[in-house]
Amino acid sequence: MAGTICFIMWVLFITDTVWSRSVRQVYEVHDSDDWTIHDFECPMECFCPPSFPTALYCENRGLKEIPAIPSRIWYLYLQNNLIETIPEKPFENATQLRWINLNKNKITNYGIEKGALSQLKKLLFLFLEDNELEEVPSPLPRSLEQLQLARNKVSRIPQGTFSNLENLTLLDLQNNKLVDNAFQRDTFKGLKNLMQLNMAKNALRNMPPRLPANTMQLFLDNNSIEGIPENYFNVIPKVAFLRLNHNKLSDEGLPSRGFDVSSILDLQLSHNQLTKVPRISAHLQHLHLDHNKIKSVNVSVICPSPSMLPAERDSFSYGPHLRYLRLDGNEIKPPIPMALMTCFRLLQAVII
């Protein structure tokens, strides 16, 4: 029970690390010098709540153009409109913007005027989900910490797109049209602080190359990935949450050491083509292997031997840390091998 609580706290810590710095900056006390308290100009197309003078609500209004943004605005909500372009002019005075939501519009790359976004020197959050983008927009402000581009038509990432985005911690590219040739060896160069990368629901057949070294959460579900190169995880030594559900991974496509990577705490390999349980690290806590083609569990292969346990033996006095194991949807039949329970003494749930 204590171990599960520790794991949950660790998950919360990681999530907080990705979000909290941005959230603190977004919700910090506003400096009265940033805007004049008597200046409550509000575009007629939008709503400016008196109790929240730094927010501008223009969502769900059938807008085709972005109105002029007053200088006091920090939070801009323009989602669910008919906007096709992002010109520079409406943002001329919007020097304090931290948050822009442009989800569910009709924005194309050709419609984004160069400099329109990069001029926003304090912008932290940019939401452009459910638009018509075919490549990651550029240039973007160096200050940006979260970029949400899910459900577009992105198939290209121009060279140098991320070169100045050293503050970016979260990049969401799920449900786009990315294929393997969208990536070069230096595609992610510049993302020194990226912690969460989501490229689920694309058309990848290979693992993306040279990911940022600080990546902790990597989501690649619902692609067509067939294999993982040897030593692939050496480049991302901090990865803790790895999701590869709904791919085409086979036993032959895995590295020789499997997933024996000490940083990985949560590993999801559901709905693949595995016939064996891969090697895992003694640190791993959650393992999802449901809906594969596994017929039996060879405990002697997957159980870390005493020599494989980390030097910090106190935390491993009860053996490996595995607590949750899903094996349902395979060809395994009960009962659970007793050797499995003997090896993984902290197991709290096994689903067959």
From Swiss-Prot:
Glycans are attached at N93, N167, N222, N298. Cornea (at protein level). Increased expression in the stroma of keratoconus corneas. Also detected in trachea, and in low levels, in intestine, skeletal muscle, ovary, lung and putamen. Keywords: Disease variant, Disulfide bond, Extracellular matrix, Glycoprotein, Leucine-rich repeat, Proteoglycan, Repeat, Secreted, Sensory transduction, Signal, Vision. Residues 1-20 form the signal peptide. Disulfide bonds join C42-C48, C46-C58, C303-C343. GO terms for biological process: cornea development in camera-type eye; visual perception. LRR repeats lie at residues 72-93, 96-117, 122-142, 143-164, 167-180, 193-213, 214-235, 238-258, 263-282, 283-304. This is Keratocan.
